[in-house]
């Protein structure tokens, strides 16, 4: 992979921290500078933008003009949005159950796994679920010593037990095989 091909999946927590003056903002800004220097493509699931708006407007009380300015600030960074397909939806269901994370967080994990890319986050639970793929940018560590790989505590996956799973998967495979 060349420098121009380098990608990072970034979750909304990193973007919101970049926009706000928080204690770990210098580390976040440093990561963005490095990504810019390296020509790294920042890729997010389409829902990223709604998460950013929600965090700023509801979580931090930003006015509409402040939210729009913030979204524009992120937009000029060239962040690329991706839609999830049905296969990624199934992987998301599995990740939610295995790692006990939200479906929104699982989208970032599945996108990073699909793209074989690192995933930048400030979310400790998401970083633990991502394991070696995580670029944890928050304070401290995500719950493990940096000298050893994180322990990923997975739970049993039950969705394959659904009696209609085989038929549904066959339908998805047939849809995927059809020319676009």
What are these regions (language model features)?
Residues 1-44, 59-67, 168:
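Short, well-structured N-terminal submotif of metal-dependent ribonuclease cores
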Residues 2-7, 82, 109-153, 157:
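Acidic, PIN/NYN-like endoribonuclease modules and their adjacent C-terminal/linker elements
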Residues 10, 43-44, 83, 103-106, ...:
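Short beta-strand scaffold positions
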Residues 14-15, 48, 88, 108, ...:
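Alpha-helix capping/helix-boundary segments
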Residues 46, 68-98:
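Acidic catalytic patch
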Residues 149-180:
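Short linear interaction segments
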